[in-house]
């Protein structure tokens, strides 16, 4: 299972072993899955940066599943939606062409760039999931982002207490892909 993500998957601000990706490895082992988790996440990562790194990661790890948890940094920087969409399309195509199943994890952004951009960004994940028939976690921080007890002081990143909740957001969509 290759997790291609940003700071939310790279355990930003907490110990790596507290992050949801490390908890995913524990869950797989406890449930008897033979899958190994490779965390190819990087704080500050964009879809473009991940796209540059993906071919080598696919070749090196040959994943059965690729989890794409990206887009937040693209949105926070106001990158053109068409470019972000094209990057996601390429990430999905490369992953699928390698033989992997894909899970798309959606993100939302604050309305810094206006309602039109914010709406287009939010809708992008559902559109990609529908077009490519992908399982989708619509908003990874649902029930977390607005709860101060689950966020670091920066208000952007989930804390250690939030990590089991992030795993529970992803698990129902991820587990069926492990059985294919």
Summary of predicted features, one role per range:
Residues 1-43, 53-62:
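Serine-esterase "nucleophile elbow" of acetyl-processing enzymes
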Residues 44-48:
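Acidic-and-aromatic substrate-binding clefts and catalytic sites of carbohydrate-active enzymes
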Residues 23-29, 33, 49-180:
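Alpha-helical cap/lid subdomain in secreted, periplasmic
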């Amino acid at each position: 299972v290759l997790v291609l993500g940003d700071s939310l998957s790279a355990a930003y601000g907490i110990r790596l072993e507290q992050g949801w990706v490390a908890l995913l490895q524990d869950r797989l082992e406890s449930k008897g899955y033979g899958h190994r988790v490779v965390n190819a996440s990087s704080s500050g990562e964009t879809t473009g940066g991940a796209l540059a790194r993906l071919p080598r990661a696919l070749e090196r790890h040959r994943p059965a599943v690729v989890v794409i948890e990206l887009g937040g940094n693209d949105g926070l920087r106001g990158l053109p939606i068409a470019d972000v969409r094209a990057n996601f399309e390429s990430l999905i195509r490369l992953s699928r062409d390698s033989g992997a199943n894909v899970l798309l994890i959606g993100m939302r952004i604050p309305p810094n760039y206006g309602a039109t951009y914010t709406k287009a960004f939010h809708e992008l994940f559902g559109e990609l999931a529908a077009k490519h028939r992908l399982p989708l976690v619509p908003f990874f921080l649902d029930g977390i982002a607005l709860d101060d007890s689950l966020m670091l002081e920066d208000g952007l990143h989930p804390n250690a207490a939030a990590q089991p909740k992030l795993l529970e957001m992803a698990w129902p969509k991820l587990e069926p892909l492990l059985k294919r």
